[in-house]
Protein backbone atom coordinates (compact mmCIF):
# COMPACT_ATOMS: atom_id res chain seq x y z
CA UNK A 1 0.00 0.00 0.00
CA UNK A 2 1.19 3.50 -0.87
CA UNK A 3 0.11 6.91 0.42
CA UNK A 4 -0.04 9.59 -2.25
CA UNK A 5 -1.40 13.06 -2.91
CA UNK A 6 -2.55 14.80 -6.07
CA UNK A 7 -3.27 18.51 -6.01
CA UNK A 8 -3.02 22.03 -7.35
CA UNK A 9 -2.73 25.26 -5.37
CA UNK A 10 -2.13 29.00 -5.56
CA UNK A 11 1.53 28.49 -6.48
CA UNK A 12 0.93 26.02 -9.33
CA UNK A 13 -2.39 27.03 -10.90
CA UNK A 14 -4.13 30.33 -11.80
CA UNK A 15 -7.37 31.34 -10.11
CA UNK A 16 -9.71 30.39 -12.96
CA UNK A 17 -8.22 26.89 -13.24
CA UNK A 18 -8.47 26.38 -9.47
CA UNK A 19 -12.09 27.44 -9.74
CA UNK A 20 -12.84 24.45 -11.96
CA UNK A 21 -11.76 22.12 -9.17
CA UNK A 22 -13.37 23.90 -6.22
CA UNK A 23 -15.78 21.75 -4.21
CA UNK A 24 -18.13 22.99 -1.50
CA UNK A 25 -18.11 20.96 1.71
CA UNK A 26 -21.42 19.27 0.86
CA UNK A 27 -19.98 18.17 -2.50
CA UNK A 28 -17.02 16.29 -1.03
CA UNK A 29 -18.94 13.18 0.00
CA UNK A 30 -20.54 12.47 -3.42
CA UNK A 31 -17.30 13.43 -5.19
CA UNK A 32 -15.30 10.91 -3.17
CA UNK A 33 -17.89 8.23 -3.84
CA UNK A 34 -17.67 8.92 -7.56
CA UNK A 35 -13.88 8.73 -7.54
CA UNK A 36 -13.74 5.47 -5.59
CA UNK A 37 -16.44 3.83 -7.69
CA UNK A 38 -14.41 4.61 -10.82
CA UNK A 39 -11.50 2.52 -9.50
CA UNK A 40 -11.35 -1.28 -9.52
CA UNK A 41 -9.91 -1.41 -6.00
CA UNK A 42 -11.39 1.41 -3.95
CA UNK A 43 -8.61 3.26 -2.09
CA UNK A 44 -8.92 5.23 1.10
CA UNK A 45 -9.47 8.82 -0.04
CA UNK A 46 -9.87 12.37 1.28
CA UNK A 47 -10.60 15.56 -0.67
CA UNK A 48 -9.48 18.97 0.61
CA UNK A 49 -10.85 22.00 -1.25
CA UNK A 50 -10.26 25.63 -0.26
CA UNK A 51 -9.95 28.91 -2.15
CA UNK A 52 -6.23 28.26 -2.57
CA UNK A 53 -6.00 24.50 -3.14
CA UNK A 54 -7.72 21.29 -4.14
CA UNK A 55 -5.97 18.10 -3.03
CA UNK A 56 -6.82 14.41 -3.07
CA UNK A 57 -5.04 12.15 -0.58
CA UNK A 58 -5.23 8.39 -1.11
CA UNK A 59 -3.95 5.21 0.49
CA UNK A 60 -3.92 2.34 -1.98
CA UNK A 61 -2.29 1.25 -5.20
CA UNK A 62 0.05 3.96 -6.54
CA UNK A 63 -0.95 2.92 -10.08
CA UNK A 64 -4.37 4.51 -9.39
CA UNK A 65 -2.78 7.97 -9.38
CA UNK A 66 -2.87 8.43 -13.15
CA UNK A 67 -6.50 7.30 -13.33
CA UNK A 68 -7.36 9.74 -10.53
CA UNK A 69 -5.73 12.62 -12.42
CA UNK A 70 -7.70 11.77 -15.56
CA UNK A 71 -10.91 11.44 -13.53
CA UNK A 72 -10.33 14.82 -11.85
CA UNK A 73 -9.54 16.48 -15.19
CA UNK A 74 -12.79 15.13 -16.65
CA UNK A 75 -14.70 16.41 -13.60
CA UNK A 76 -13.20 19.87 -14.08
CA UNK A 77 -13.81 19.93 -17.82
CA UNK A 78 -10.15 20.21 -18.81
CA UNK A 79 -7.68 17.91 -20.55
CA UNK A 80 -5.47 15.63 -18.44
CA UNK A 81 -2.45 17.33 -20.04
CA UNK A 82 -3.56 20.77 -18.82
CA UNK A 83 -4.23 19.54 -15.30
CA UNK A 84 -0.95 17.62 -15.24
CA UNK A 85 0.98 20.78 -16.14
CA UNK A 86 -0.41 22.59 -13.08
CA UNK A 87 -0.68 19.72 -10.60
CA UNK A 88 1.74 18.05 -8.21
CA UNK A 89 1.90 14.40 -7.19
CA UNK A 90 3.57 13.24 -3.99
CA UNK A 91 4.14 9.77 -2.56
CA UNK A 92 4.71 8.32 0.92
CA UNK A 93 7.11 10.52 2.94
CA UNK A 94 6.65 13.47 0.55
CA UNK A 95 2.85 13.14 0.77
CA UNK A 96 3.02 12.96 4.57
CA UNK A 97 5.34 15.98 4.75
CA UNK A 98 2.98 17.95 2.51
CA UNK A 99 -0.05 17.05 4.63
CA UNK A 100 1.78 18.12 7.80
CA UNK A 101 2.91 21.41 6.21
CA UNK A 102 -0.62 22.14 4.97
CA UNK A 103 -2.15 21.46 8.40
CA UNK A 104 0.47 23.68 10.06
CA UNK A 105 -0.16 26.60 7.70
CA UNK A 106 3.32 26.46 6.15
CA UNK A 107 1.95 25.86 2.65
CA UNK A 108 -0.72 28.57 2.85
CA UNK A 109 -0.72 31.87 1.00
CA UNK A 110 -1.04 33.42 4.47
CA UNK A 111 1.87 31.83 6.33
CA UNK A 112 0.69 30.27 9.57
CA UNK A 113 -3.00 31.02 9.03
CA UNK A 114 -5.20 28.88 11.33
CA UNK A 115 -8.26 28.45 9.09
CA UNK A 116 -6.68 25.66 7.02
CA UNK A 117 -6.57 23.30 10.01
CA UNK A 118 -10.33 23.60 10.49
CA UNK A 119 -10.89 23.11 6.76
CA UNK A 120 -8.74 19.97 6.83
CA UNK A 121 -10.71 18.59 9.78
CA UNK A 122 -13.95 19.27 7.90
CA UNK A 123 -12.55 17.39 4.88
CA UNK A 124 -11.64 14.40 7.04
CA UNK A 125 -15.13 14.31 8.57
CA UNK A 126 -16.67 14.43 5.09
CA UNK A 127 -14.44 11.52 4.01
CA UNK A 128 -15.54 9.56 7.07
CA UNK A 129 -19.20 10.22 6.21
CA UNK A 130 -18.49 8.96 2.68
CA UNK A 131 -16.98 5.75 4.08
CA UNK A 132 -13.71 6.63 2.34
CA UNK A 133 -11.44 6.82 5.38
CA UNK A 134 -9.37 3.85 6.51
CA UNK A 135 -6.74 3.22 9.15
CA UNK A 136 -3.86 4.59 7.04
CA UNK A 137 -5.37 7.99 6.22
CA UNK A 138 -6.81 8.16 9.73
CA UNK A 139 -3.27 7.87 11.08
CA UNK A 140 -1.94 10.39 8.55
CA UNK A 141 -4.45 13.09 9.45
CA UNK A 142 -4.54 12.51 13.20
CA UNK A 143 -0.77 12.90 13.13
CA UNK A 144 -1.19 16.00 10.92
CA UNK A 145 -3.45 17.58 13.53
CA UNK A 146 -1.00 16.73 16.33
CA UNK A 147 1.95 18.15 14.39
CA UNK A 148 -0.01 21.32 13.57
CA UNK A 149 -0.87 21.79 17.25
CA UNK A 150 2.78 21.39 18.25
CA UNK A 151 3.91 23.84 15.55
CA UNK A 152 1.43 26.47 16.71
CA UNK A 153 2.22 26.08 20.41
CA UNK A 154 6.01 25.71 20.07
CA UNK A 155 6.74 28.34 17.41
CA UNK A 156 5.59 31.84 16.44
CA UNK A 157 4.58 30.76 12.95
CA UNK A 158 1.25 32.58 13.18
CA UNK A 159 2.59 35.74 14.80
CA UNK A 160 1.90 38.98 12.91
CA UNK A 161 0.32 37.13 9.98
CA UNK A 162 -2.19 39.07 7.91
CA UNK A 163 -5.32 37.20 6.88
CA UNK A 164 -7.20 37.74 3.63
CA UNK A 165 -9.89 39.49 5.65
CA UNK A 166 -7.38 41.83 7.29
CA UNK A 167 -5.71 42.47 3.93
CA UNK A 168 -9.08 43.56 2.53
CA UNK A 169 -9.42 46.17 5.26
CA UNK A 170 -5.84 47.36 4.70
CA UNK A 171 -6.45 47.84 0.96
CA UNK A 172 -9.74 49.62 1.59
CA UNK A 173 -7.86 51.98 3.90
CA UNK A 174 -5.55 52.88 1.03
CA UNK A 175 -8.50 53.87 -1.17
CA UNK A 176 -10.75 55.61 1.37
CA UNK A 177 -9.40 58.31 3.66
CA UNK A 178 -11.73 57.34 6.51
CA UNK A 179 -13.28 53.86 6.72
CA UNK A 180 -15.76 55.27 9.21
CA UNK A 181 -17.46 57.10 6.32
CA UNK A 182 -18.09 54.11 4.03
CA UNK A 183 -20.96 51.67 3.56
CA UNK A 184 -19.85 48.03 3.34
CA UNK A 185 -21.72 45.12 1.76
CA UNK A 186 -20.79 41.51 2.48
CA UNK A 187 -22.04 38.86 0.07
CA UNK A 188 -22.25 35.42 1.69
CA UNK A 189 -22.35 34.32 5.32
CA UNK A 190 -19.55 31.76 5.64
CA UNK A 191 -16.37 31.74 7.71
CA UNK A 192 -14.45 34.10 5.42
CA UNK A 193 -17.24 36.70 5.41
CA UNK A 194 -17.50 36.34 9.18
CA UNK A 195 -13.79 37.19 9.48
CA UNK A 196 -14.04 40.06 7.01
CA UNK A 197 -17.06 41.54 8.80
CA UNK A 198 -15.20 41.31 12.11
CA UNK A 199 -12.22 43.23 10.72
CA UNK A 200 -14.35 45.90 9.03
CA UNK A 201 -16.59 46.30 12.09
CA UNK A 202 -13.49 47.21 14.10
CA UNK A 203 -13.16 50.29 11.83
CA UNK A 204 -16.78 51.34 12.63
CA UNK A 205 -18.00 51.97 9.06
CA UNK A 206 -21.10 54.10 8.49
CA UNK A 207 -23.17 50.99 7.78
CA UNK A 208 -22.84 47.28 7.06
CA UNK A 209 -25.15 44.96 5.14
CA UNK A 210 -25.12 41.23 4.47
CA UNK A 211 -26.61 39.66 1.36
CA UNK A 212 -27.08 35.92 1.46
CA UNK A 213 -29.04 33.27 -0.39
CA UNK A 214 -30.75 32.18 2.84
CA UNK A 215 -31.97 35.04 5.05
CA UNK A 216 -31.82 32.96 8.23
CA UNK A 217 -28.06 32.48 8.09
CA UNK A 218 -27.55 36.06 7.00
CA UNK A 219 -29.62 37.34 9.93
CA UNK A 220 -27.61 35.25 12.39
CA UNK A 221 -24.36 36.86 11.22
CA UNK A 222 -25.85 40.34 10.86
CA UNK A 223 -27.15 40.33 14.43
CA UNK A 224 -23.57 40.23 15.73
CA UNK A 225 -22.62 43.42 13.91
CA UNK A 226 -25.86 45.36 13.83
CA UNK A 227 -25.89 44.94 10.05
CA UNK A 228 -28.79 45.04 7.61
CA UNK A 229 -29.80 41.80 5.86
CA UNK A 230 -30.83 41.65 2.22
CA UNK A 231 -31.63 38.99 -0.35
CA UNK A 232 -29.22 38.15 -3.15
CA UNK A 233 -32.03 38.91 -5.59
CA UNK A 234 -31.97 42.56 -4.44
CA UNK A 235 -28.24 42.90 -5.08
CA UNK A 236 -28.34 44.38 -8.63
CA UNK A 237 -30.78 47.14 -7.66
CA UNK A 238 -28.94 48.13 -4.47
CA UNK A 239 -25.29 47.66 -5.41
CA UNK A 240 -24.76 51.39 -5.98
CA UNK A 241 -25.49 52.13 -2.31
CA UNK A 242 -22.21 50.59 -1.14
CA UNK A 243 -18.65 51.87 -1.26
CA UNK A 244 -17.07 48.50 -0.50
CA UNK A 245 -18.25 45.02 -1.51
CA UNK A 246 -16.66 41.87 -0.07
CA UNK A 247 -17.92 38.64 -1.61
CA UNK A 248 -17.28 34.99 -0.79
CA UNK A 249 -19.97 32.42 -1.59
CA UNK A 250 -19.96 28.81 -2.72
CA UNK A 251 -21.67 29.66 -6.01
CA UNK A 252 -20.29 27.88 -9.06
CA UNK A 253 -21.13 30.89 -11.26
CA UNK A 254 -20.52 34.64 -10.81
CA UNK A 255 -23.32 36.35 -8.90
CA UNK A 256 -22.20 39.94 -9.57
CA UNK A 257 -22.09 40.58 -13.30
CA UNK A 258 -20.53 43.28 -15.44
CA UNK A 259 -23.90 44.86 -16.29
CA UNK A 260 -24.96 45.24 -12.66
CA UNK A 261 -21.68 46.94 -11.75
CA UNK A 262 -21.85 49.24 -14.81
CA UNK A 263 -25.29 50.43 -13.66
CA UNK A 264 -23.99 50.92 -10.12
CA UNK A 265 -21.06 53.03 -11.37
CA UNK A 266 -23.44 55.35 -13.25
CA UNK A 267 -25.76 55.73 -10.25
CA UNK A 268 -22.78 56.47 -8.01
CA UNK A 269 -21.75 59.25 -10.40
CA UNK A 270 -18.32 57.66 -10.69
CA UNK A 271 -17.49 57.67 -6.99
CA UNK A 272 -14.96 54.85 -6.45
CA UNK A 273 -16.14 51.40 -5.46
CA UNK A 274 -13.85 48.93 -3.69
CA UNK A 275 -14.56 45.25 -4.41
CA UNK A 276 -12.89 42.10 -3.07
CA UNK A 277 -13.74 38.68 -4.51
CA UNK A 278 -12.53 36.05 -2.04
CA UNK A 279 -14.41 33.21 -3.74
CA UNK A 280 -13.02 30.37 -5.85
CA UNK A 281 -14.57 30.06 -8.38
CA UNK A 282 -15.17 33.79 -8.79
CA UNK A 283 -18.26 35.58 -7.46
CA UNK A 284 -17.57 38.71 -9.54
CA UNK A 285 -17.07 38.61 -13.30
CA UNK A 286 -13.40 39.39 -14.07
CA UNK A 287 -14.31 42.02 -16.70
CA UNK A 288 -15.54 44.24 -13.83
CA UNK A 289 -11.88 45.01 -13.09
CA UNK A 290 -11.62 47.03 -16.32
CA UNK A 291 -14.43 49.46 -15.41
CA UNK A 292 -13.43 53.01 -14.44
CA UNK A 293 -13.74 53.82 -10.72
CA UNK A 294 -13.83 50.12 -9.80
CA UNK A 295 -11.02 48.64 -7.69
CA UNK A 296 -11.47 44.87 -7.81
CA UNK A 297 -9.15 42.45 -6.04
CA UNK A 298 -9.14 38.64 -6.06
CA UNK A 299 -7.50 36.21 -3.63
CA UNK A 300 -4.44 36.12 -5.87
CA UNK A 301 -4.24 39.93 -5.96
CA UNK A 302 -4.12 39.97 -2.16
CA UNK A 303 -1.06 37.70 -2.10
CA UNK A 304 1.49 40.53 -1.91
CA UNK A 305 -0.34 42.10 1.03
CA UNK A 306 -0.56 38.93 3.13
CA UNK A 307 3.13 38.18 2.55
CA UNK A 308 4.08 41.18 4.70
CA UNK A 309 6.32 40.11 7.55
CA UNK A 310 6.92 36.65 6.10
CA UNK A 311 10.70 37.15 6.04
CA UNK A 312 10.65 37.96 9.75
CA UNK A 313 9.13 34.54 10.49
CA UNK A 314 11.73 32.39 8.77
CA UNK A 315 13.18 31.33 12.13
CA UNK A 316 9.74 30.05 13.12
CA UNK A 317 9.48 28.23 9.79
CA UNK A 318 12.80 26.47 10.45
CA UNK A 319 11.58 25.40 13.90
CA UNK A 320 8.33 24.15 12.40
CA UNK A 321 10.17 22.12 9.76
CA UNK A 322 12.11 20.28 12.50
CA UNK A 323 8.82 19.31 14.16
CA UNK A 324 7.42 18.22 10.81
CA UNK A 325 10.53 16.14 10.03
CA UNK A 326 10.06 14.20 13.25
CA UNK A 327 6.37 13.69 12.47
CA UNK A 328 7.18 12.36 8.99
CA UNK A 329 9.75 9.91 10.37
CA UNK A 330 7.28 8.60 12.95
CA UNK A 331 4.53 8.20 10.37
CA UNK A 332 6.81 6.39 7.91
CA UNK A 333 7.95 4.05 10.70
CA UNK A 334 4.30 3.27 11.46
CA UNK A 335 3.54 2.82 7.75
CA UNK A 336 6.51 0.47 7.36
CA UNK A 337 5.23 -1.65 10.22
CA UNK A 338 1.76 -1.56 8.72
CA UNK A 339 3.06 -2.94 5.43
CA UNK A 340 4.30 -6.11 7.20
CA UNK A 341 0.81 -6.94 8.50
CA UNK A 342 -0.18 -9.11 5.48
CA UNK A 343 3.07 -11.09 5.82
CA UNK A 344 2.52 -11.57 9.55
CA UNK A 345 -1.02 -12.79 8.85
CA UNK A 346 0.34 -15.19 6.23
CA UNK A 347 2.94 -16.57 8.63
CA UNK A 348 0.34 -17.07 11.35
CA UNK A 349 -1.98 -18.86 8.92
CA UNK A 350 0.86 -21.11 7.71
CA UNK A 351 2.00 -22.07 11.21
CA UNK A 352 -1.60 -22.74 12.26
CA UNK A 353 -1.90 -25.09 9.29
CA UNK A 354 1.31 -26.93 10.27
CA UNK A 355 0.19 -27.15 13.89
CA UNK A 356 -3.20 -28.58 12.95
CA UNK A 357 -1.55 -31.19 10.70
CA UNK A 358 0.88 -32.30 13.42
CA UNK A 359 -1.83 -32.46 16.07
CA UNK A 360 -3.95 -34.63 13.79
CA UNK A 361 -0.94 -36.93 13.24
CA UNK A 362 -0.26 -37.08 16.98
CA UNK A 363 -3.87 -38.05 17.72
CA UNK A 364 -3.62 -40.95 15.28
CA UNK A 365 -0.42 -42.17 16.98
CA UNK A 366 -2.10 -41.96 20.39
CA UNK A 367 -5.09 -43.91 19.04
CA UNK A 368 -2.69 -46.63 17.88
CA UNK A 369 -1.31 -46.89 21.41
CA UNK A 370 2.09 -45.31 20.72
CA UNK A 371 3.99 -44.23 23.87
CA UNK A 372 3.35 -40.59 24.81
CA UNK A 373 7.08 -39.73 24.72
CA UNK A 374 7.30 -41.03 21.15
CA UNK A 375 4.19 -39.05 20.15
CA UNK A 376 5.55 -35.82 21.63
CA UNK A 377 8.91 -36.41 19.97
CA UNK A 378 7.24 -36.94 16.58
CA UNK A 379 5.04 -33.87 17.11
CA UNK A 380 7.91 -31.52 17.93
CA UNK A 381 10.18 -32.93 15.22
CA UNK A 382 7.44 -32.51 12.63
CA UNK A 383 6.90 -28.88 13.61
CA UNK A 384 10.59 -27.96 13.64
CA UNK A 385 11.17 -29.68 10.29
CA UNK A 386 8.31 -27.73 8.71
CA UNK A 387 9.55 -24.45 10.21
CA UNK A 388 13.16 -24.96 9.12
CA UNK A 389 12.56 -26.52 5.71
CA UNK A 390 12.39 -23.22 3.79
CA UNK A 391 15.45 -21.74 5.52
CA UNK A 392 17.54 -24.90 5.00
CA UNK A 393 16.54 -25.08 1.33
CA UNK A 394 17.63 -21.45 0.81
CA UNK A 395 20.97 -22.12 2.53
CA UNK A 396 21.74 -24.82 -0.04
CA UNK A 397 20.54 -22.79 -3.05
CA UNK A 398 22.15 -20.01 -5.08
CA UNK A 399 25.74 -18.84 -5.38
CA UNK A 400 28.23 -18.21 -2.58
CA UNK A 401 27.26 -14.55 -2.12
CA UNK A 402 23.53 -15.27 -1.83
CA UNK A 403 24.20 -18.20 0.55
CA UNK A 404 26.28 -15.92 2.77
CA UNK A 405 23.52 -13.30 2.85
CA UNK A 406 20.95 -16.00 3.63
CA UNK A 407 23.19 -17.38 6.39
CA UNK A 408 23.31 -14.00 8.14
CA UNK A 409 19.52 -13.60 7.83
CA UNK A 410 18.87 -17.10 9.20
CA UNK A 411 21.35 -16.46 12.01
CA UNK A 412 19.57 -13.23 12.94
CA UNK A 413 16.14 -14.88 12.88
CA UNK A 414 16.87 -18.24 14.51
CA UNK A 415 20.10 -17.79 16.51
CA UNK A 416 19.17 -14.38 17.99
CA UNK A 417 22.05 -12.58 16.33
CA UNK A 418 24.80 -15.13 16.95
CA UNK A 419 27.18 -15.12 13.95
CA UNK A 420 27.04 -18.32 11.88
CA UNK A 421 29.92 -20.65 12.66
CA UNK A 422 32.49 -20.95 9.92
CA UNK A 423 32.97 -24.35 8.31
CA UNK A 424 36.40 -25.86 9.07
CA UNK A 425 38.00 -28.19 6.55
CA UNK A 426 39.34 -31.46 8.03
Swiss-Prot record:
Pathway: Porphyrin-containing compound metabolism; protoporphyrin-IX biosynthesis; 5-aminolevulinate from L-glutamyl-tRNA(Glu): step 1/2
Chain residues that bind substrate: 50-53, 108, 113-115, 119
Record: residues binding NADP(+): 188-193
Catalytic activity: (S)-4-amino-5-oxopentanoate + tRNA(Glu) + NADP(+) = L-glutamyl-tRNA(Glu) + NADPH + H(+)
Enzyme class, broadest EC rank: oxidoreductase
Listed Pfam families: GlutR_dimer, GlutR_N, Shikimate_DH
A GO BP annotation: protoporphyrinogen IX biosynthetic process from glutamate
GO terms for MF: glutamyl-tRNA reductase activity; NADP binding
Annotated site (Important for activity): 98
Subunit structure: Homodimer.
Biological role stated in the UniProt entry: Catalyzes the NADPH-dependent reduction of glutamyl-tRNA(Glu) to glutamate 1-semialdehyde (GSA).
Misc remark: During catalysis, the active site Cys acts as a nucleophile attacking the alpha-carbonyl group of tRNA-bound glutamate with the formation of a thioester intermediate between enzyme and glutamate, and the concomitant release of tRNA(Glu). The thioester intermediate is finally reduced by direct hydride transfer from NADPH, to form the product GSA.
Family: Belongs to the glutamyl-tRNA reductase family.
This protein's domain notes: Possesses an unusual extended V-shaped dimeric structure with each monomer consisting of three distinct domains arranged along a curved 'spinal' alpha-helix. The N-terminal catalytic domain specifically recognizes the glutamate moiety of the substrate. The second domain is the NADPH-binding domain, and the third C-terminal domain is responsible for dimerization.
Name by which UniProt lists this protein: Glutamyl-tRNA reductase
Species of provenance: Polaromonas sp. (strain JS666 / ATCC BAA-500)
